[in-house]
Swiss-Prot record:
Gene3D superfamilies: Trypsin-like serine proteases. This is Streptogrisin-D. GO terms for cellular component: extracellular region. The keyword Protease applies. The gene is sprD. Its EC number is 3.4.21.-. Homodimer. Residues 65-204 form a propeptide.
Length: 392
């Protein structure tokens, strides 16, 4: 992938920056498959001794086996691994149990529930890993959490490394809410794990230096093209509250909202209404830029970079996909990318990318860039599909 480091010229341009909103929290709007035999049953049938381990509320023991050799595992880039993961997830069907990129070995690790699936993975060039919980079972566990534990300040996502649903509670979850959440997670047994995070889950909304609207500030995510016309993507909780934008406080309009989706999703589309230059680049805050040529899906284990006007450029890793986060006030967002990239108020709506590939728009999270934290991103491909747009 190519990195463009073009020095800034004297011509005013509007690059990809991380949106932030300085105002109150936004208003709410709105092939046959082998039949597998459970490993648990096989263990009970083949042994007279069953070890029962009580782990309290946090289930630390993974139900996965790493003893399957990586026959023929291909050396892959993160991008190639992501494409292989998509193909295998489709081909494995009910035998699929998630996957992640091993950045050290440069291989795609694919979870499966039986040897037939493992052989299919090896033939495709992945490293097979037989685990206890299928992806369908983990999705069912997520459904239980949605039904019984929809509590502000919580999030959950399937973690393919531990083969569990990782449930996280922020500092606001205590008392009866904590007891309720703990009981639900405990009831899910080896399918879930409960953890705490410092701080509070919130959309990362605050002042920035990119675009202004109605006394509030945000900054764009990625420049895109729709029907041959220029637009940009930003966070939905920005476009939910502001209808038009300028590139200076009190300045002339440069764009007007064309669409907004928040909560449930967190993306918005703004159409340029001026002749402001709009290159498909991300500001690297060192006088250079990163060219963006395509959009893609993130992969667990992938190294990623975030650009934001508050904390500028920071790196991290994708830890989960299809995450759900409850920001409170009924603002629940689904299908997010969960990462270890730090972020702070003012970075909201900013660009998450890997090389020249656009991955996400900063939604929210907890912690900061001094102590670290968890940050969630709206996938870019979903937003592009919703609006019929493309990177450009």
């Amino acid at each position: 992938m190519c990195v463009s480091r073009r020095r800034n010229s004297g011509r005013p341009i509007l690059r990809v920056r991380a949106p932030h909103l300085l105002r109150a929290r936004p208003h709410r709007r709105s092939k046959l498959k082998h039949r597998r035999i459970s490993r648990k049953r096989a263990t009970l049938a083949g042994s007279a001794v069953v070890a029962l381990v009580a782990a309290g509320f946090t289930f630390q023991t993974a139900n996965a086996s790493d003893d399957v050799p990586a026959f023929g595992a291909k050396t892959l880039s993160a991008d190639a691994a992501g494409k292989l993961a998509t193909t295998l997830d489709r081909d494995l069907g009910a035998d699929a149990a998630g996957s992640y990129y091993d950045a050290t070995a440069k291989t795609l690790v694919v979870n499966v529930v039986d040897e037939a699936g493992a052989e299919q993975v090896r033939q495709a060039g992945g490293k097979a890993r037989i685990v206890e919980n299928s992806l369908a079972e983990l999705k069912s566990a997520r459904g239980t959490l949605t039904e019984k534990a929809t509590i502000p300040g919580t999030s959950w996502a399937v973690d393919p490394v531990s083969n569990k649903v990782l449930v996280t509670a922020d500092s606001t979850v205590d008392g009866a809410a904590w007891k309720k959440l703990s009981a639900v997670v405990e009831g899910l047994g080896g399918k879930a794990e409960l953890n705490r995070t410092a701080g509070e889950f919130t959309p990362l909304i605050a002042g920035g230096d990119a675009i202004w609207g109605s006394g509030s500030r945000c900054s764009l995510g990625f420049n895109v093209v729709k029907g041959g016309e220029p637009y940009f993507l930003t966070a939905g909780h920005c476009t939910e509250s502001v209808t038009s934008w300028s590139d200076t406080q009190g300045g002339s309009e440069i764009g007007a909202n064309e669409g907004s989706s928040f909560p449930e999703n967190d993306y918005g589309l703004v159409k340029y209404t001026s002749d402001t230059a709009h290159p498909s680049e991300v500001n690297l805050y060192d006088g250079s830029t990163q060219a963006i040529t395509q959009a893609g899906d993130a992969t667990v284990g992938q190294a990623v970079t975030r650009s934001g006007s508050t904390t500028q450029v920071h790196d991290g890793e994708v830890t989960a996909l299809d995450a759900t986060v409850n920001y409170g006030n009924g603002d629940i967002v689904n299908g997010l990318i969960q990462t270890t990239v730090c972020a702070e108020p003012g970075d909201s709506g900013g660009a998450l990318f890997a090389g020249d590939t656009a991955l996400g728009l900063t939604s929210g999270g907890s912690g900061d860039c001094s102590s670290g934290g968890t940050t969630f991103f709206q996938p870019v491909p979903e937003a592009l599909a919703a609006y019929g747009a493309e990177i450009g």
